[in-house]
Curated annotation (Swiss-Prot):
Taxonomic lineage from the root: Bacteria, Bacillati, Bacillota, Clostridia, Moorellales
Binding site for Zn(2+): 880, 882, 891-892
Residue sites binding ATP per the record: 86, 104-108, 493
Cofactor(s) named in the record: Zn(2+)
Reaction equations catalysed: ATP + H2O + cellular proteinSide 1 = ADP + phosphate + cellular proteinSide 2
Organism: Moorella thermoacetica (strain ATCC 39073 / JCM 9320)
Biological role: Part of the Sec protein translocase complex. Interacts with the SecYEG preprotein conducting channel. Has a central role in coupling the hydrolysis of ATP to the transfer of proteins into and across the cell membrane, serving as an ATP-driven molecular motor driving the stepwise translocation of polypeptide chains across the membrane.
Pfam families in UniProt: P-loop_SecA, SEC-C, SecA_DEAD, SecA_PP_bind, SecA_SW
Enzyme class: translocase
PANTHER family membership: CHLOROPLAST PROTEIN-TRANSPORTING ATPASE, SECA INNER MEMBRANE COMPONENT OF SEC PROTEIN SECRETION SYSTEM
Protein family (similarity comment): Belongs to the SecA family.
Gene designation: secA
Keyword annotations of the record: ATP-binding, Cell membrane, Cytoplasm, Membrane, Metal-binding, Nucleotide-binding, Protein transport, Translocase, Translocation, Transport, Zinc
GO molecular function: ATP binding; metal ion binding; protein-exporting ATPase activity
The protein's name in its UniProt record: Protein translocase subunit SecA
Amino acid sequence: MVLGILRNLLDDNARDIKKLSRQVEAINALEPEIQALSDSDLQAKTPEFRRRLERGETLDELLPEAFAVVREASRRVLGMRHFDVQLMGGIVLHQGRIAEMKTGEGKTLVATLPAYLNALTGRGVHIVTVNDYLARRDSEWMGRIYRFLGLKVGLIVHGLDAAERREAYNADVTYGTNNEFGFDYLRDNMALHPEEMVQRELNYAIVDEVDSILIDEARTPLIISGMAEKPTEMYYTVAAIIPRLQPNIDYNVDEKAKVATLTEAGVAKVEKMLGVDNLYDDANMELAHHVNQALKAHTLMKRDRDYVVKDGQVIIVDEFTGRLMFGRRYSEGLHQAIEAKEGVKIERESQTLATITFQNFFRMYDKLAGMTGTAATEEEEFRKIYNLDVVVIPTNKPMIRKDYPDVVYRTEKGKFEAVVEEIRERHAKGQPVLVGTISIEKSERLSEMLKKRGIPHQVLNAKYHEKEAEIIAQAGRLGAVTIATNMAGRGTDIILGGNPEALAKEKMRQKGYSPEIIAAATAIKVDEGDPEVMAARQDYQQFLAAARRETEEEHRRVVELGGLHIIGTERHESRRIDNQLRGRAGRQGDPGSSRFYVSLEDDLMRLFGSDNLTGILDRLGMDDSTPIDHPLVSRSLEQAQKKVEAHNFDIRKHVLEYDDVMNKQREIIYRQRREVLTGADIRPTIEDMIKTVVDQTVDRFAGESKYPEEWDLAGLLDYAEQLFLPGCDREALANAIKEMEKEEVYGFLREKAMEAYRQREEELGPETLREIERLILLRVVDTKWMDHLDAMDQLRQGIGLRAYGQQDPLVAYKFEAYQMFNDMIASIQEDVVRYLYRVKVVQPQAERPRQVVENRYAGEASGPRQPVRREHKVGRNDPCPCGSGKKYKKCCGAGK
């Protein structure tokens, strides 16, 4: 059965490649004709293609010629000609699919083909990378092709102001990170004026390292938040009592599910220490939450594995890359609980203002495509969640890397000793070795062992920056030993013998040249009129010639030694991450090899491996230093990985099912908010709101009765005066209503409310009133949406308990979320009407600056991943967020 499915998938892929080959032949047939064009004729192709699109030609019809033009432009500007397999990858991306291309096959260059073709429509193309360094590098490097062909290139990175962002989004091709694109979408949907918005429509996105962004980061919510008014003392109080609890008596820990729970004895002990009668009483809900988070912080969150303490701050370690995630924070008070545990200053909790997950953000694009070296293992998830097919593109040259079988040891100590011994043997020969670890803790342990043996090496496990890319680029040099967390330096090729261009640029930096001069001097086309650039160019060429002589000799020797050798010190939960590590070797037909070392004490085997395994090995009498070669071990390893992959897929699918409910609500609110922001006249909307509020007020106080004498007339008049009839003649109204039927009352009060509304319009003037209406509506919607997000979050946290009452939690969540959404809409209408009839016009305030500080939160692996947070504070002189029209310091901020 499984073999049949696999055969079908392979057959499908072979059919795809055959079709793609025919399109590649059509592109290649145009090459002589395109090569014969002058630079100006080649550049004139862009306006010609645009005219042809206007006349009705499709992008698919333009594809062969457009791809041929990009290939020729790349050859002239960068000195790089797209291979046939790169053309195939480009076609797949244009079709809105995922191209799986092995490491070193030039994915960065592939993206230029569909990006150019789709940019011809004028609707914009977003190329999404995993970090600012790659976005900046690719926009400068590949940007030369687009600029040569007359397209504008934009770059979205952290630190740009609104005008710079708008300009970057208005470019034909925009490079940026997934976080920046997502945050700009959220900020645009919090804008109070159309000119504050920066993004255009979400037309076409090409996601580089698509598996990292759409799978690994899938559960990461992007969150814009403001400071919540919550005290921090309770965190310290609770942190002090947790160490006094005893494991397995007062609490139990399930590492596999990543859950820690108090036993009945533990609850009683905590209640006694905190001086409360019932920890789970309604009045103590917040206290119970503090206790649960503190327990998690002390038992499940490990220092130097999940986080580090640096300069008095708790900094999260990315579980996939091992990098320090500066600015990210765990959510729901977990980060504060860890800060209390470690005795550092506690930062205040935040309140969510706007949020979206990457899953839902990227599904909003009209067309989505991606590329990666490893996607086939997650093909089912890409298809089910994102409706994306995966096409495996063949390598340009045959893959000759040797992947050796895993070596399994009984203990971690025995495993690491064997790893160090293999590194020593290969280093002694001069063969470069790249060692992948899964945590900072493990990489530092291995580094200490290598130091004791006198083996020189580089360790990479910090925040991504250019230096890391350079070290990774030189990891193929003779005798190099590099220890890196599994994905550090992703996006940078390891060239056997070393990278001569990088070595030459390093020499120029040492000589004191600025980054701008280095970039100008190393370009294919140089400004010959600039003497400083020409002098730098001369130095670069000398350094490059010397570096080439050095690296060519090293390349020859490294190839003879078998190329780069990869050592994995532990199997990751996902086979895909293991394949990424392996993929660092054997690029572009180079030789290479890989081997994984595993111990039965590794988390994967300990938590998900076969329970029978240890007993069998005990009976066999295996010692720590003897590798285990048994089919049961290999089988157990593979089953453990499949088990975890299936478990993680189920979690992501489950999260999406819940998030889809919120997503539909978000789409409605943001769509209507955008209409208010950009629409010419919102008077009809306001009139509808007034009529709805009048009708709801009558229904609330009249109930089912048709007769006024049975109504709560005093309540009705109080509410009407409060909302839409300020300063009304209550006695006259009461007398009039007593003589009417219920249906007449609706019409009577509507007319009275509209009369008061028209009076407001005369007082303030139509133009002023429209602007006031717009601001009130936006402010009220934002405030209510913020409260709704908190309420939905609380509903979500507690909904799982419905299963105990034989209720499907998802069905219950959908039903209650729908009710809450309707209540929010009614509340928005009431508040808008109330403010509208009472607002006073004050002098306009200076436009407030956007103060946005990045601050991310993350949940444990079984819940949502680390949300990426950005915060902003209301300035004392800003308009108050409540919509009153007063300054914050004279309204809700009084006395603060």
